[in-house]
Amino acid sequence: MQDTTLHIRHLGKQDYESVWHAMQHYTDTRDSESHDELWIVEHPPVFTQGQAGKSEHILNAGDIPVIQVDRGGQVTYHGPGQLVVYPLLDIKRSKVGVRQLVTHIEQSIVDMLAKYDINAYAKADAPGVYVDERKIASLGLRIRKGCSFHGLALNVDMDLAPFRRINPCGYAGLEMAQCKALGGPQTVIEAGEQLTITFSQLLGYQHLVHHQGLAAS
């Protein structure tokens, strides 16, 4: 039976590795009674290389660290002004398939941007969300013990130049877009608030409980 309560954790600005390890710990130690959670965070500049990643897609990392991680997908960039959302969900309990979860995540971004009259869309052959063939949101998940972690990154109001140091998600020359320039959410906080609404509605959560920071381990 699905847990109809979703716990939202507002983490503020946090370094990537500490949040990644906290996600792993939560997933490894959760049981059938554990809450479904949505972690909302903003990271300092970092490139993360997924399990399918190839080193040749990192063109010139320069002074930005590269971290090899355990999510699906290839290389992407996180930095200030980007909304990062990690859904820590028991999809086995809620009977949601992995492909269905990916579709729900993409659609929640599309629905949120539609409120701002931005015509965004997903692609069957390239996970993420796009506007006029430019990528505005990236997606990479990991499923362990029937539970999801890692998640999505939505460009809101950021310096997009570091994306030119990589082939984003393995695609050479892929152009990026961001919300503020398109008349969408102007801040990471606004984007997080709006995306939480569309995501929880699509996944069938009826109650939202908000927390500041991570739970004490």
UniProtKB/Swiss-Prot annotation:
Every copy of the BPL/LPL catalytic domain together lies at 32-207
Q: Name one GO biological process term.
A: protein modification process
GO CC terms: cytoplasm
Major site of localization recorded for this protein: cytoplasm
Reactions the enzyme catalyzes: octanoyl-[ACP] + L-lysyl-[protein] = N(6)-octanoyl-L-lysyl-[protein] + holo-[ACP] + H(+)
Q: What is the lineage of its organism?
A: Bacteria, Pseudomonadati, Pseudomonadota, Gammaproteobacteria, Alteromonadales
This protein's pathway: Protein modification; protein lipoylation via endogenous pathway; protein N(6)-(lipoyl)lysine from octanoyl-[acyl-carrier-protein]: step 1/2
Q: Which InterPro entries match?
A: aa-tRNA-synth_II/BPL/LPL, BPL_LPL_catalytic, Octanoyltransferase, Octanoyltransferase_CS
* UniProt subcellular location: Cytoplasm
- Domain of life, per UniProt, equals Bacteria
Show which residues form the site (Lowers pKa of active site Cys).
135
Q: One MF term from GO for this chain?
A: lipoyl(octanoyl) transferase activity
Miscellaneous remark of the record? In the reaction, the free carboxyl group of octanoic acid is attached via an amide linkage to the epsilon-amino group of a specific lysine residue of lipoyl domains of lipoate-dependent enzymes.
**What is annotated as the active site?**
169 (acyl-thioester intermediate)
Enzyme type, top EC level = transferase
Q: Which family does it belong to?
A: Belongs to the LipB family.
Gene that specifies this protein: lipB
Return the protein name. Answer: Octanoyltransferase
